[in-house]
Amino acid sequence: MEKIPVSAFLLLVALSYTLARDTTVKPGAKKDTKDSRPKLPQTLSRGWGDQLIWTQTYEEALYKSKTSNKPLMIIHHLDECPHSQALKKVFAENKEIQKLAEQFVLLNLVYETTDKHLSPDGQYVPRIMFVDPSLTVRADITGRYSNRLYAYEPADTALLLDNMKKALKLLKTEL
């Protein structure tokens, strides 16, 4: 009878020790820069900018774009694609892109939509397209590749910034 409380007490002590283990860096010791656990992104951002407001579906994004009079930026990507991952890292870490992105309705998709206007030159990733508040796909705002018009690479951040500004500027002159 006495063994059960003693066993429970020992189990609690072991569990408390495990949970309360000192994880702070001691003075003079090097901090391990590699975290053993991967950082989980916010559900809708999928790591593209956790502080930004993202929409869940294409239909919701179109509605918000029209009602808020903001352009829509759609990012097509895949979690397992190394090109998508590289672009995501640059997009999320670039302060200027993140600041400018606040002026858009944002949607990132890991699946294709039924709207064929969003894949005029094929279904490839990563692909970034813009839609204006009148729900017109901005086919004129393209990346630097002739065979993948809406593709961007990590080195294309200046072009992406220019295209984001173009989407905002043309929005103001058209309305």
UniProtKB/Swiss-Prot annotation:
InterPro entries: AGR/TXD, Thioredoxin-like_sf. Keywords: Disease variant, Disulfide bond, Endoplasmic reticulum, Proto-oncogene, Secreted, Signal. GO terms for biological process: digestive tract morphogenesis; inflammatory response; lung goblet cell differentiation; mucus secretion; positive regulation of cell-substrate adhesion; positive regulation of developmental growth; positive regulation of epidermal growth factor receptor signaling pathway; positive regulation of gene expression. Expressed strongly in trachea, lung, stomach, colon, prostate and small intestine. Expressed weakly in pituitary gland, salivary gland, mammary gland, bladder, appendix, ovary, fetal lung, uterus, pancreas, kidney, fetal kidney, testis, placenta, thyroid gland and in estrogen receptor (ER)-positive breast cancer cell lines. CDD domains: AGR (cd02960). Changing residue 71 to T: In RIFTD; uncertain significance. Its main location: secreted. It is found in: Secreted; Endoplasmic reticulum. A motif (Homodimer stabilization) lies at residues 45-54, 60-67. Residues 1-20 form the signal peptide. Pfam families: Thioredoxin_7. Residues 21-40 are annotated as: Required to promote cell adhesion. Gene3D superfamilies: Glutaredoxin. GO terms for molecular function: dystroglycan binding; epidermal growth factor receptor binding; identical protein binding. GO terms for cellular component: endoplasmic reticulum; extracellular region; extracellular space. It is linked to Respiratory infections, recurrent, and failure to thrive with or without diarrhea: An autosomal recessive disorder characterized by neonatal onset of recurrent pulmonary infections, coughing, wheezy episodes, interstitial lung disease, and bronchiectasis. Episodes of vomiting and chronic diarrhea result in failure to thrive. Results of sweat chloride and pancreatic elastase tests are normal. Required for MUC2 post-transcriptional synthesis and secretion. May play a role in the production of mucus by intestinal cells. Proto-oncogene that may play a role in cell migration, cell differentiation and cell growth. Promotes cell adhesion. Belongs to the AGR family. Monomer and homodimer. Interacts with LYPD3 and DAG1 (alphaDAG1). Interacts with MUC2; disulfide-linked. This is Anterior gradient protein 2 homolog. The gene is AGR2.
